């Protein structure tokens, strides 16, 4: 199971430097049978970002359809609130949910979240295409 953070999924609806890399990475993971998962917080964050950037809701929903969205648990919120460090609320909630779900990997592009995830014992990835030599 691969937990996907908003910083990664947003690249699937907004053209950014790593957009092709993360799309390829997640497509390959799905082809291998890995499930993509996130908390319902992703639904809210992605739709709000879509509204701000005038991204059609249909495109946002198409991307979300490939991700298993799980409900937040009260324990996720409590655990996120108790986390040491300087994570923003949403990042702490995503990390708490990934830990509860025992995700094998967290895909994100937020440096603070990635650092906290590694400190919590999770494997992490921020896919980028490496130039060929």
Predicted regions mapped to residue ranges:
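Alpha-helix capping/helix-boundary segments
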Residues: 8-9, 42, 76, 94, ...
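Alpha-helical elements of the RecA-like P-loop NTPase motor core of helicases
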Residues: 20, 48, 78, 114-115
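Acidic, PIN/NYN-like endoribonuclease modules and their adjacent C-terminal/linker elements
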Residues: 1, 28, 43, 70, ...
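Short glycine-/small-residue-rich flexible loop motifs, especially phosphate/cofactor-binding loops
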Residues: 47, 61, 95, 114
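Short beta-strand scaffold positions
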Residues: 4, 37-38, 71, 89-92, ...
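Amphipathic alpha-helical segments within well-ordered protein domains
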Residues: 7-10, 47, 81, 99
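Short, well-structured N-terminal submotif of metal-dependent ribonuclease cores
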Residues: 1-37, 50-62, 120-133
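Acidic catalytic patch
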Residues: 63-85
């Amino acid at each position: 199971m691969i937990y996907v953070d908003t910083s990664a999924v947003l690249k699937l609806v907004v053209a950014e430097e790593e957009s092709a890399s993360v799309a390829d990475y997640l497509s390959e993971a799905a082809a291998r049978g890995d499930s993509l998962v996130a908390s319902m917080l992703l639904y809210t964050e992605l739709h709000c970002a879509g509204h701000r950037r005038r991204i059609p809701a249909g495109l946002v929903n198409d991307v979300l359809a490939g991700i298993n969205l799980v409900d937040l648990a009260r324990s996720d919120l409590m655990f996120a609130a108790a986390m040491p460090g300087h994570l923003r609320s949403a990042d702490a909630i995503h990390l708490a949910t990934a830990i509860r779900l025992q995700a094998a990997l967290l895909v994100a592009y937020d440096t603070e979240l990635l650092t906290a995830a590694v400190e919590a014992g999770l494997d992490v990835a921020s896919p980028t295409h490496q130039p060929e030599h």
